[in-house]
Structures are given as structure tokens and as C-alpha cells.
Amino acid sequence: MLRFFIIFSVLLIGLFTLEILQPAEKYVILPFTSMVADISVWIVQGFDENVIATGNVIRDKVSGFGVRIERGCNGLEAVIILFSAIFAFPAPFKNKVIGFVAGFFAIQLLNLVRIISLYYLGQWNYTAFEWFHLYLWQALIILDALVVWLIWLRTLPGSRAHPDNLEPETA
């Protein structure tokens, strides 16, 4: 347990430090965040043609309302937490890679739901938008990383999560 905590802490601190460096901002964070905005708009345009993306901003062409996807709103912090937890845990490397890739997409999928819901919530009620943005959705994205990690733990070899590994109860 101590080994896990130390490796988890080192990975977490190291990755969050890398994330705030200027080259990471310029070459990873900003392009990724713009891509998240573009994907969000692509999804929304399936049922609302009045939405556009400009960089990291999603805007309604009619009302002018927009949301800016900033650092901390692109899901990468939750991905860093998940990566640190998965790669700190003693498990086969193949399982770590599979768990991380699946977890990355699970977090980003929920983040797209978050961004789109906040886009429409902000047009409806700005106070509700602020509350959901600052409190509910931030907690849910981090909780998503935790849930993905817990599910991943149950899929590891030797885990008792598989029904065929369970021994029958004795009477």
C-alpha cells in the first residue's frame, strides 16, 4: 500500500507539473482543448445547427452565448489522476494500457456530456450553469476517474470479480 501511495504521488505531482509547463500548454493542452470543442460542436450540430466552435469556445450563433473550455475543463486532470492510479498499481503492463485507454475514453465521453449540458444550461439559467459547472460536474468527472479505476481493478487477473473464480459456499 505504501509503494502504491508513493508511486501514485510521484506520478501525480510529475504529470501535473508537466501539464503546467509552457511547451505542454502550447503543443498538447491547447490543441487537445480545441479538439474537445470541435467534437462537442460536431455532436451538437446533429440537432442544433446554430452552434459554432472557435478555438476553445463554443458559441450559439443566434444568442451569442458561449462557453470557453479552459484548463481544468478538458478532462485531462481526471485523466492524469486515472493514469497515476493505474500505473502505480502492481498489475501486468498490458492490463494497465488497456485500462488507461478505456478510462481515457470513458472520462472524455462524460466530459463531452458535461460540456454540452453546460452549454445549454448556460443559455437557460446562468446561476444554474455556475452551480453545475463549479460543484456538480467537477466532482462527477473526478468520481468518473475513481469509478473507472475501481472497475479496472476488478478486471485484473486474480481478481475475485469474475463469477468463474468464485468458490461455492459450504452449508
Task: Outline where the language-model segments fall.
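Hydrophobic N-terminal alpha-helices or hydrophobic patches in metabolic proteins across all domains
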Residues: 1-171
